[in-house]
Regions:
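N-terminal Sec-pathway targeting helices
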Residues: 19-29
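Sequence-structural signature of mature extracellular/luminal beta-sheet repeat domains
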Residues: 42-409
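Bacterial N-terminal signal peptides
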Residues: 31-39
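Residue-level detector of intrinsically disordered, flexible termini
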Residues: 2-3, 7, 27, 31, ...
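N-terminal secretory signal peptides that target proteins for export/translocation
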Residues: 1-21
Length: 409
């Protein structure tokens, strides 16, 4: 085969394409094919950009790249929420999980490692409400919300590579463990004998305790008839790691749920400061939106000295006036904190970036309301934006809890 393509000089022994017209054709055609393939893959993998980025303080320039653009990587959701980046040790790549509170599903988005983007796939169905429960189909948002990877220190029989999730379930009005094999365990369902409203977001503390919020969004029915509210406030709670472990072992939801705060009207997103001495919580109320900060006891994990970190009511009013009071263009919602204490928060008009002192240093302006944000292991920040997923390259790095912390304390 090769002899028919290549002519060999009898004296030098060198390959000479000029002696064979087939080789001349090969030298022209092959680079053209490669070039076409590169252009084709670039076109197929290209993603539309959206929104604008505004620098309000020089410090924000150190967190983003020049000429950064936000790009839409997935669409087709109804209300996307709960973004969670998962490192896949088997492929040395990561992927994004996110929930849809109205479709009652968890989706997965992969970049992939081949020539073409893998994109969006279904990760878990009926992940917020079981279909055999009659009220699921009557609820406005029966699905899952916040997602959190289960720590293996609390599940000694689980492999480090296993992706077991703690899920805030609106329809079940519970926090549940959904294992990678599809089995489920209810971790917590009640506070003092009363059913939760609709758990919204959740995070780990370094000690392995679980903090979560429980507003009442998930109680809304499609026909205007809401599910009965059993707890007369919307709270911020904690479950200690030993009680989580016991719940997993027994298969029964824990009764040891600790109320940390009951004063916020709609507690939603929450995150710790880099040294874990403070807890930030957003209040996602269109009539009284703000971010609050609490001191965290290093001994008990209890909260104290709650005060307003940033009052969002003026921003909410501006957005209402801008859009003619017709739609909601973002309340204080989910957020993340970087290693320097900057807060990347979904809020009025897009994603606001706060300094640790509470000043807005930058904005990611978007034309649709943003529900939450997540740091990716690929150097990007991911946004759940109404019916789509958006990402942008950033320099900021997330605060991380090392797994060994759970074992030491």
């Amino acid at each position: 085969m090769f002899a028919s393509l290549w002519s060999v000089e009898s004296i030098s022994g060198k390959l000479n394409p000029n002696k064979n017209p087939q080789i001349s054709w090969f030298y022209v055609f092959f680079p053209a094919v490669i070039g076409y393939f590169v252009i084709l893959t670039g076109y197929i993998n290209s993603k539309p950009s959206t929104g604008t980025i505004e620098i309000l303080h020089p410090s924000f320039s150190t967190l983003i790249y020049p000429n950064s653009k936000m790009e839409i990587i997935a669409s087709g959701s109804v209300w996307s929420e709960g973004p969670l980046w998962v490192e896949d040790e088997s492929t040395s790549l990561g992927y994004l999980l996110y929930s849809d509170t109205q479709l009652n599903k968890i989706f997965r988005w992969d970049e992939g490692k081949g020539f073409f983007t893998v994109g969006k796939t279904l990760h878990s169905e009926k992940s917020g409400c079981k279909i055999d429960k009659g009220y699921c189909e009557t609820m406005h948002e029966p699905g899952p919300n916040g997602l959190l990877k289960m720590n293996v220190a609390l599940m000694p029989i689980t492999s480090q590579k296993s992706v077991d999730l703690l899920v805030c379930q609106h329809g079940e009005r519970a926090i549940s463990l959904i294992k990678e094999n599809g089995s489920r365990i209810l971790i917590a369902t009640h506070y003092q004998g009363n059913r939760f409203n609709s758990p919204n977001d959740l995070i780990w503390s370094p000690e392995g305790n679980l903090y979560f919020t429980d507003p009442s969004y998930g109680l809304m029915g499609k026909d205007g008839i809401n599910v009965k509210k059993e707890i007369q406030f919307n709270g911020v709670y904690m479950i200690r790691k030993d009680d989580i472990s016991e719940s997993i072992l027994t298969g029964l939801p824990t009764k040891n749920v600790i109320l940390l705060d009951s004063e916020m009207s709609m507690p939603n997103g929450l995150a710790f400061s880099p040294d874990f001495s403070k807890l930030y919580v957003s209040n996602s109320d269109t009539e009284n939106g703000y971010w609050k900060v609490f001191n965290v006891s290093p001994n008990t994990g209890a909260l104290s000295n709650g005060r307003i970190f940033y009052d969002a009511n003026n921003l909410l009013l501006l957005e209402k006036e801008k859009h003619g009071y017709k739609e909601n263009y973002g309340n204080p919602d989910g957020f993340r904190v970087d290693i320097y204490g900057n807060i990347f928060a979904s809020g009025p008009g897009g994603v606001l970036v706060f300094s640790p002192e509470g000043d807005i240093i930058g904005k990611f302006h978007l034309d649709k309301p943003v529900s939450n944000v997540a740091f990716g292991g690929d150097g990007r920040l991911y946004f759940t934006v109404s019916d789509m997923i958006v990402r942008v390259f950033i320099k900021a790095k997330p605060v991380r809890i090392i797994s060994s912390h759970f074992l030491k304390r």
